[in-house]
Each structure stands twice: as structure tokens, then as C-alpha cells.
């Protein structure tokens, strides 16, 4: 998690990516995990999640 990202934003990213993976999206990293949420967490840690957060202040 970067310094400006809240835990809610992280949770939203991980949940969205896990849903994509559960529906058959390709995995972006090499991993031994088979559960979508664990794969999403590894992708997040590797910095390869295909999401950005646009805040409207």
C-alpha cells in the first residue's frame, strides 16, 4: 500500500481484481496460489494491478 492510498482503496482494488480472476481473467504474475483473492494480493504486492484510483475532492 502506498502512503497516499487508504485501506479501503486497497480493499476495493483487491476485491475487484479477485472478481475478475474468478470470472476467468488472466493472471498477471507467476504464482502457486489458486484462490482469486490470494492471487490478487500477490499481484498487488508486485505492483501489477491494472487499477488506478481517481479521487474527487
UniProtKB/Swiss-Prot annotation:
Signal peptide interval: none
Alphabetized Pfam families for the sequence: RNA_pol_Rpb6
Gene3D superfamilies per UniProt: 3.90.940.10
Main enzyme class: transferase
SUPFAM superfamilies in the record: RPB6/omega subunit-like (SSF63562)
Entry keyword set: Cytoplasm, DNA-directed RNA polymerase, Nucleotidyltransferase, Transcription, Transferase
GO molecular function: DNA binding; DNA-directed RNA polymerase activity
One term under GO cellular component: cytoplasm
InterPro entries: DNA-dir_RNA_polK_14-18kDa_CS (IPR020708), Pol_omega/Rpo6/RPB6 (IPR006110), RPB6/omega-like_sf (IPR036161), Rpo6/Rpb6 (IPR006111)
Main localization of the protein described in the UniProt heading: cytoplasm
Localization (cell): Cytoplasm
GO biological process per UniProt: transcription by RNA polymerase I; transcription by RNA polymerase II; tRNA transcription by RNA polymerase III
EC numbers on record: 2.7.7.6
Catalysed reactions, as listed in the record: RNA(n) + a ribonucleoside 5'-triphosphate = RNA(n+1) + diphosphate
NCBIfam families (UniProt xref): PRK01099.1-3
HAMAP family: RNApol_arch_Rpo6 (MF_00192)
PANTHER family in UniProt: DNA-DIRECTED RNA POLYMERASE SUBUNIT K, DNA-DIRECTED RNA POLYMERASES I, II, AND III SUBUNIT RPABC2
Record function comment: DNA-dependent RNA polymerase (RNAP) catalyzes the transcription of DNA into RNA using the four ribonucleoside triphosphates as substrates.
Subunit structure: Part of the RNA polymerase complex.
Family recorded in the similarity comment: Belongs to the archaeal Rpo6/eukaryotic RPB6 RNA polymerase subunit family.
This protein's name: DNA-directed RNA polymerase subunit Rpo6
Lineage, broadest ranks: Archaea, Methanobacteriati, Methanobacteriota, Stenosarchaea group, Halobacteria
Amino acid at each position: 500500500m502506498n502512503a497516499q492510498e487508504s485501506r479501503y482503496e486497497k480493499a476495493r482494488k483487491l476485491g475487484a481484481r479477485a472478481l475478475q480472476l474468478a470470472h476467468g481473467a488472466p493472471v498477471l504474475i507467476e504464482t502457486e496460489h489458486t484462490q482469486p483473492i490470494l492471487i490478487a494480493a500477490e499481484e498487488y504486492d508486485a505492483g501489477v494491478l491494472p487499477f488506478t484510483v481517481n479521487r474527487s475532492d
